[in-house]
């Protein structure tokens, strides 16, 4: 797993994007989310769907505004049902949470590379990356992390014989690639 999984993912994404090289990757084990959420002081969300995890004592109700504690954040990100296309709901929760997380972490670091380094040191054991720390910090501060900088590959989820399958809308993907790589510059 770990590094090999990341390298395979990079190759698959590059292939999907017509051979465009992927400059780097950062992946984190979910157990690191407890630490990140704590460093961020929690993340406030409007709960997108009911999420329960009795083992963690989590019972979130759709529509409530909630500052997620560490266990709630973990459950909110991991929760999934067996319903068709449930992965899409999970992705929506992940995007929502990540936007709030990076807002909070950026506010805590406030351009202070030493504070960012301390945060990184606390989660380093959970991270797999081929990117140098200073570049990660620089890119996150420069790039920002909001809904305008997140793209969803267009396509359709269909039920196969045993599992859901996602079929990419190649024309729509091409449009996004053109928008991101050419219109942004």
How does the language model describe each region?
Residues 1-3, 19-24, 80-89, 105-110, ...:
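Second-shell loop/turn segments in exported
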